Every structure is written in C-alpha cells, then in structure tokens.
From Swiss-Prot:
Brain, but also small intestine, kidney, liver and heart. GO terms for molecular function: chloride transmembrane transporter activity; cysteine transmembrane transporter activity; glutamate:sodium symporter activity; high-affinity L-glutamate transmembrane transporter activity; L-glutamate transmembrane transporter activity; metal ion binding. The keyword Metal-binding applies. Contains eight transmembrane regions plus two helical hairpins that dip into the membrane. These helical hairpin structures play an important role in the transport process. The first enters the membrane from the cytoplasmic side, the second one from the extracellular side. During the transport cycle, the regions involved in amino acid transport, and especially the helical hairpins, move vertically by about 15-18 Angstroms, alternating between exposure to the aqueous phase and reinsertion in the lipid bilayer. In contrast, the regions involved in trimerization do not move. It comes from Oryctolagus cuniculus. The gene is SLC1A1. This is Excitatory amino acid transporter 3. Belongs to the dicarboxylate/amino acid:cation symporter (DAACS) (TC 2.A.23) family. SLC1A1 subfamily. Homotrimer. Interacts with ARL6IP5. Interacts with RTN2 (via N-terminus); the interaction promotes cell surface expression of SLC1A1. Interacts with SORCS2; this interaction is important for normal expression at the cell membrane. L-aspartate binds at S331, S333, T370, V411, R447, T448, N451.
Length: 524
C-alpha cells in the first residue's frame, strides 16, 4: 500500500512542478498538427491567416510588455547588490565567457560549411530571391551602435533607437540648404560613368524598438552609483527590487497563457509559409547551420560548463527547458528573458546577484547562434558565386561575424543589417542576402535557442568562478544592510534535504509575517 501511494504522490508532485512545461510541449505538437491540417484542407485568405494567428500575437505582446521593467529593475538591483570591485570582476568574467563562446561558434560554423560545401552544388540563379536588400554602411552601423550606447534621452530610449541614413545631395539641394540644417555632409567616391564624386549627407533618424544597449549602460552606471550611496540610495534599491518582484509576478500570470499562445504561433506560421519548395533547394545549407547549432549546444557549451563547474550540464539544461521551448517558439532572446530568469533562479537555483547582472547583458550581446549562422551564410553565398575565399577573407568573416553578433542589439533591424555587414566585409554582393531570407524565420528560432542556452550556462559558470567573492559579500552583509539580497537561509523542500541559501527580497526580512518585507520564492 505504501509504495503505490508514494508513487501517486511523486506523480502528482511532478505534474504540479512541470505542468507548464508539459502543456507547452503538448501545445507545440497540437500547433504543428493544426497548422498542417488547416493548410491542407482549407483555403484561407491573407486576412484569415492574420486573424488565425491573433492569440499568438497577444502572447508576443505580453512578453514584450515586461522586457523593459524587467531589464531596468534587474540590472539596477543586481549591480547595486554587488561591490564595485566584485561587479567589475563578474562583468569581466561574463564578457570573456561570451566572447570565447562566440569565437568558438564562428570557428565551428566555418569548419562545417567549408567541409560540407552546401553551396558548391548549386548556383545563384537556381534559388529564388525573397525580400529586399537594406542599404547599409558598415561605418555608420558601428557608429550607430556606439551612439545607442549613450542615448541622449532616457525616455526615448525606452521605445526608439537611433539610426543614420545617407541621402544623396543634388545641386538643387545644395543651393537650397539653410543655416539651420543639422545634418552632416559626407563626401564619398562612387563608381559612376563620369567618375565624379557624389556628395551624401548623413541624416539622423529614430526607428521603433527598445534601445536595450543604451538602457543597460545607464542601468549599470546607475546601479553602481546608488550602491555606493549607502542609506541614501537604499530607498531606490528597495523600489527597483520591489519592481523586479512585481514584474516576475506578472510573468507568472503571462506564463499561464503561454501554451495557448504558442499553439497559435506555430499553427499560424505553418499556414503563413507560401513556398515549401525553398526548403528542398536550401536543404543542405539548413542542415549545415542546424548541425553547427546542435554541436555547439549539445557538446561545446555543456563541456565548458562541466570543466568549470564540475556538475552535470544536461541536468542544468533540463532546468532551462521551459525557457528553451519559449525561445524556439517566439524567436527572441529578449522576449524570452522573463522565462529565463524564472528557470535560472527557481529551477537551477542560480544566485540572483548573478542572474540579474549577467542575463540582461547576455540577452543583448551573447549571440553564439547568430554568429555561427552569419559565418555559415557568408561562406555559403561565396560558394554559390564560385568565389574561392582566402585565409585572410575567412578570418575577416570570423571577426566581422563575431563583432556583428555582439553589436546586433544596438543596430535597428539587426538581422539583415548585420548579415549585409558580413557580406560587404569580404566583397560579396549584398543583394545575395535575399537568397536565404526565405528560410531565415525557421533558422532564427533554433539559433535563438542556442543564444538562450549560452546565456543560461554563463550564469552557472560565472557563479562558480565568483563563489569566493559572493561568500565574502555574504559575510560582510551581516553588517552592511545596503545589500538588497542580504542572505536569508531557507530550507528548500527537495529530495536532497540539503539546506540551500535563498536570496529573498532584501535584507530587512525579520518578521516573516509581514507581507511587505518578506516574499517567498514561487515555484513553477
């Protein structure tokens, strides 16, 4: 009697703790089935397809809604909780990890595409072009990246990014200019028949989208400042800590809707795709990209984690399953960030002082999957054009793909723009980016999964490397009440019956009956 009852309790506990994950998996399967059936047996108009995907659109809007408060509150509280020297060390370790894994991903992608040669058996004319090629200047894109790191208006940075465009100056424009015009004039030589120079003026514009890079830079500095202000800054620390907790409560509500939204996202995308024949034409190219992403996520990242942390990396990855599924469905590292926080902190028990500092930065600059994809795509397009790349050009692709992926968050319409930058760096025709746009929506989902997994492993690795500094801060927090994550020991109800440390809601939680000063960590 005892054993069946215990098995029943274990099953109920498993379902209770993993109902969201299981329902998401079921939603993915149902979404694929419904999408295929609707595509085969109904003839929906473009308007009908738009309405069909509406529940999925609502999920995306809700997730994007919490990105801004989550990034701002988590970055500020995370940095304020750390000593400036400690935060510098943690930041350096995180950036080194991001840089090394991105370089490894690029090298892996180039090795695979050079070995498999997916573009050798095909010609440019055999593949249909989709979309248009954006006009991109590498210099302007890099300068825009730096400009966006230092926004001139903090409120505007919450919904717009700075972007420069070039406009050709004609003779009539030149005579009509007045003294109040603020645009900068640049002169460049172009290959025209008269072999004359053309004049361009650089015009600054703003495009829609959160300036994540600028907000992170500001929050980093702001968090360091209020962390050093002592008791004067404590009220701000408490405010942003409460904002972070409130945002995560909202995330819990959103995740209850997630299975339904994901079902319609998947089904809607399957119905929307016009030409499935393109997948056959670009099949070998897709296999090359997916093979690289699989090797990087299943072999390289877990190996790095195991070498540093000395724990089972696949158990850690299992704790991130919900975040990885979300990334696969919605194809956005930033929109997945709320789920990534929950998985890292509640499933894998990573220190909040690490996750709140490392994850927002990782979601912005750590793009292993994107770097690998861009390197493979550049060499693939070179093979389509029968262009033999030299060692110098391959190195150029590697460096450019790494830099472009790191700076992608600070560049408006980053996907196409960064790809054009990589192609232009080695003299490949920028318009050939339209050859791979048709399958980009699918590959983008898988490379987002790799990006999120890399961020997650990064928190575990940085936490291990920073263990000594965190323990020293735990000791000093007994006399330093400024730390918003002052240590409280909590016994976690798990099978190991070990006493683990939980960083809960601030250093003033003395009376646990006080709902304002004490908040329990919620579970899935």
């Amino acid at each position: 009697m005892g054993k069946p009852a215990r098995k029943g309790c274990d099953s109920k506990r498993f379902l209770k703790n993993n109902w969201l994950l299981l329902s998401t998996v079921v939603a993915v399967v149902l979404g694929i089935v419904i999408g295929v059936l609707v595509r085969e047996y109904s003839n929906l108009s473009t308007l009908d397809k738009f309405y069909f995907a509406f529940p999925g659109e609502i999920l995306m809007r809700m997730l994007k809604l919490v990105i801004l408060p989550l990034i701002v509150s988590s970055m500020i509280t995370g940095v304020a909780a750390l000593d400036s020297n400690v935060s510098g060390k943690i930041g350096l370790r995180a950036v080194l990890y991001y840089f090394c894994t991105t370089i490894i991903a690029v090298i892996l992608g180039i090795v695979l595409v050079v070995s498999i040669k997916p573009g050798v058996t095909q010609k440019v004319d055999e593949i249909d072009r989709t979309g248009s090629t954006p006009e991109v200047s590498t210099v302007d894109a890099m300068l825009d990246l730096i400009r966006n790191m230092f926004p001139e208006n903090l409120v505007q940075a919450c919904f717009q990014q700075y972007k420069t465009t070039r406009e050709e100056v004609t003779a009539s424009d030149d005579t009509g200019k007045n003294g109040t015009e603020e645009s900068v004039t640049a002169v460049m030589t172009t290959a025209v028949s008269e072999n004359r120079t053309k004049e361009y003026r650089v015009v600054g514009l703003y495009s829609d989208g959160i300036n994540v890079l600028g907000l992170i830079v500001f929050c980093l500095v702001f968090g360091l400042v209020i962390g050093k202000m002592g008791e004067k800054g404590q009220i701000l620390v408490d405010f942003f800590n409460a904002l972070s907790d409130a945002t995560m409560k909202i995330v819990q509500i959103i995740m209850c809707y997630m299975p339904l939204g994901i079902l319609f996202l998947i089904a809607g995308k399957i119905i929307e795709v016009e030409d499935w024949e393109i997948f056959r034409k670009l099949g070998l190219y897709m296999v090359t990209v997916l093979s690289g992403l699989a090797i990087h996520s299943i072999v390289i990242l877990p190996l790095i984690y195991f070498i540093v942390v000395r724990k089972n990396p696949f158990r850690f990855a299992m704790g991130m399953t919900q975040a990885l599924l979300t990334a696969l469905m919605i194809s956005s590292s930033s929109a997945t960030l709320p789920v990534t926080f929950r998985c890292a902190e509640e499933k894998n028990r990573v220190d909040k002082r690490i996750t709140r500092f490392v994850l927002p930065v990782g979601a912005t600059i750590n793009m292993d999957g994107t770097a690998l994809y861009e390197a493979v795509a550049a060499v693939f397009i070179a093979q389509l054009n029968d262009m033999d790349l030299s060692i110098g050009q391959i190195i150029t692709i590697s460096v450019t793909a790494t830099a472009a992926s790191i700076g992608a968050a600070g560049v408006p319409q980053a996907g196409l723009v960064t790809m054009v930058i990589v192609l232009s760096a080695v003299g490949l025709p920028a318009e050939d980016v339209t050859l791979i746009i048709a399958v980009d929506w699918l590959l983008d989902r898988f490379r987002t999964v790799v990006n999120v997994l890399g961020d997650a492993f990064g928190t575990g690795i940085v936490e291990k490397l920073s263990k000594k500094e965190l323990e020293q801060m735990d000791v000093s927090s007994e006399v330093n009440i400024v730390n918003p994550f002052a240590l409280e020991s909590a016994t976690l109800d798990n099978e190991d019956s070990d006493t683990k440390k939980s960083y809960i809601n601030g250093g003033f939680a003395v009376d646990k009956s006080d709902t304002i000063s004490f908040t329990q960590t919620s579970q899935f």
